[in-house]
A protein has these predicted regions:
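Core catalytic alpha/beta fold that binds nucleotide/phospho-ligands
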Residues: 1-205
Length: 205
């Protein structure tokens, strides 16, 4: 139904392909046909079942998140931990000042301003991608205030840790450097202090 609302054929095809891949991946974890998967939504902010982060109806602890950026689609899957993933194409125009106004903490803005002028847009784009991944992991999305927290290096791992007023425990976020034509990041909460990420495939085209 959602695909039918997309007017451009190329964009509609990308949407359909990404969601077909999502179904195939999730079905492989549960050893069932993709068409038998049932999804549900509940908003983490207001509890409304008409919108919110998608979940499997019979998940067995499986959690997932999908992001699309142009022809690139990324799927993140975890067990018994919330997950969010985001990607932003490298060729997308970025204005670091606009990102700073919308999403960066004072520490992050200072970090961007201290960078070489030619690197500021790129750095802000990467910080934005991390923020989006965290927002998706929490399930709060745009209801999460992105400017009140900073993802900082965690001494025990390669992850960055973000302490949010809205969450009882830190959210961990890491860049996905294997994705070469986009900024990409994955975030998890409820997975302990040093989650392991295995990248099985990252294909654009």
């Amino acid at each position: 139904a959602r695909a039918a609302l997309i007017r451009l054929p190329d964009k509609r095809a990308e949407f359909v392909a990404a969601h077909a891949a999502l179904r195939a991946i999730l079905a492989s974890y549960q050893d069932i046909p993709p068409e038998s998967l049932l999804f549900t939504t509940t908003c983490a902010w207001c509890g409304d079942p008409q919108h919110g982060k998608p979940r499997l109806q019979d998940s067995g602890g499986l959690r997932f998140n999908l992001t699309r950026a142009g022809t690139l689609a990324l799927v993140a899957v975890t067990r018994n931990a919330e997950v969010g993933v985001d990607a932003e194409p490298l060729d997308r125009a970025v204005d670091w000042r606009a990102i700073a106004r919308r999403a960066l903490s004072s520490d992050e803005r200072a970090q961007v301003e201290a960078a070489e002028p030619g690197l500021r847009d790129s750095l802000a784009g990467r910080l934005w991608c991390r923020k989006e991944a965290v927002a998706k992991a929490t399930g709060l999305g745009l209801a999460l205030n992105l400017k009140t927290w900073t993802a900082r290096p965690d001494s025990n791992s390669r992850w960055l840790a973000a302490s949010l007023d809205e969450m009882p425990e830190p959210v961990f976020v890491s860049d996905l450097d294997t994705v070469t034509d986009a900024f990409a990041a994955v975030a998890v909460t409820g997975a302990g202090e040093d989650p392991t990420v295995t990248v099985r495939d990252a294909v654009s085209g």
